[in-house]
């Protein structure tokens, strides 16, 4: 055992440790019948599943965050997802997050096939958003349309999205439904919509898109951001909800959505935007809070302040957090000396959940709060977050 420990330590030090880790049997609560039905529904819609036998875990990936090693892991996961998913592409948010990951992967890896798949997707849907507007989820696919437009300058790629955003600006704001009086009433919305609006500004120069973005983000932040914990509640119904240990309920994926939304918005926000400093300050506050509660395995549990009640790490939230931290370092908004070790540990932790065929597991199914899930569970949005994280980690070496 001592010799084996020395071998592992030397391999880690060399940045060449190969993923032969196998998770121990978990005592985590199993999904309820209702949650299992949700898993089945997700599988029927082709954006994820949780098989009883997903096969062996990968043994050919390095924990190193050097560009070549990260690229290998990204390709393995991206190729598995693209092959099984492309025939079923849709415009719902569960897919659009994957599309953002594919766009980032093409840029990072220098491989046009993922971007080409996105162009084909846009053509399939005539570059239109889903119809349930102003719902932020249904705006999210516009991020990919706009990124393709900024590369190819084809006005047809953004004309329907621009028409829809302009209609939102012209309509009365908010809803009369209690808790939903603002457009972005749940924290996930801050990943889904704001990057669309900042990209529309980049595409058109229209200041009105940034004005709406800044105004609506401020409303959501005022309602859902806890200025003590520096974390976001999922929505106003969770303001008084607590975990089993009595602490406030903060969902890892929800907070990952917010952090990811901040950096994806900042990347297209002009330097003189009056709210820019507020976004950066909130990113710094959240990064500090999340780094302090990173688990020993490098990841975050579904319930951030009650990790003892969630044995298994949750990959979609962890990947979004890792993406935001790496993007924050690359943007000069976060201190590399402080956050690089956090990022390295998180990336290594995520690789423990890559299977031999490329499946990325330990992703919580769709929902609104921490829930039990299976080790094999893999969903498109978690893969998208993983690819975003890998792309930013590779930039750290440029």
What positions do the PLM features span?
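Oxyanion-binding "anion nests"
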Residues: 259-305
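Extended ligand-binding groove/face enriched in aromatic
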Residues: 112-119, 127-239, 244-250, 357
């Amino acid at each position: 055992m001592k010799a084996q420990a020395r071998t592992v330590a030397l391999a880690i030090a060399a940045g060449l440790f190969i993923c032969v880790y196998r998770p121990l049997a978990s005592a985590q609560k199993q999904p309820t019948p209702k949650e299992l039905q949700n898993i089945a529904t997700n599988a029927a819609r082709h954006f994820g599943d949780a098989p009883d036998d997903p096969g062996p875990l990968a043994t050919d990936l390095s924990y190193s965050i050097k560009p070549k090693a990260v690229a290998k892991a990204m390709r393995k996961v991206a190729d598995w997802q693209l092959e099984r998913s492309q025939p079923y592409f849709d415009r719902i948010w569960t897919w659009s997050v994957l599309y953002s990951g594919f766009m980032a992967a093409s840029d990072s890896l220098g491989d046009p096939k993922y971007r080409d798949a996105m162009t084909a997707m846009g053509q399939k849907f005539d570059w239109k958003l889903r119809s349930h507007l102003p719902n932020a989820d249904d705006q999210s696919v516009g991020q990919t349309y706009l990124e393709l437009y900024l590369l190819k300058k084809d006005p047809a790629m953004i004309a329907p999205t621009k028409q829809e955003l302009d209609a939102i600006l012209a309509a009365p704001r908010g809803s009369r439904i209690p808790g939903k009086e603002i457009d972005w009433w749940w924290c996930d919305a801050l990943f889904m919509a704001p990057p669309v609006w900042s990209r529309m500004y980049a595409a058109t120069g229209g200041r009105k898109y940034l004005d709406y973005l800044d105004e609506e983000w401020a409303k959501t932040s005022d309602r859902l951001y806890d200025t003590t914990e520096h974390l976001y509640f999922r929505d106003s119904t969770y303001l008084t909800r607590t975990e089993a240990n009595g602490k406030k309920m903060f969902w890892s994926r929800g907070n990952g959505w917010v952090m990811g939304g901040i950096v994806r918005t900042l990347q297209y926000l002009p330097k003189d935007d009056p709210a820019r400093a507020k976004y950066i300050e909130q990113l710094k506050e959240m990064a500090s809070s999340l780094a302090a509660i990173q688990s020993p395995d490098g990841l975050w549990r579904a319930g951030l302040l009650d990790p003892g009640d969630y044995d298994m790490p949750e990959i979609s939230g962890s990947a979004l957090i890792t993406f935001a931290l790496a993007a924050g370092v690359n943007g000069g908004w976060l201190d590399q000396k402080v956050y690089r070790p956090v990022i390295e540990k998180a990336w290594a932790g995520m690789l423990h959940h890559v299977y031999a065929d490329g499946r990325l597991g330990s992703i919580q199914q769709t929902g609104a709060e921490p829930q039990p899930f299976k080790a094999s569970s893999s969903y498109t949005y978690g893969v998208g977050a993983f690819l975003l994280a890998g792309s930013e980690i590779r930039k750290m070496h440029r």
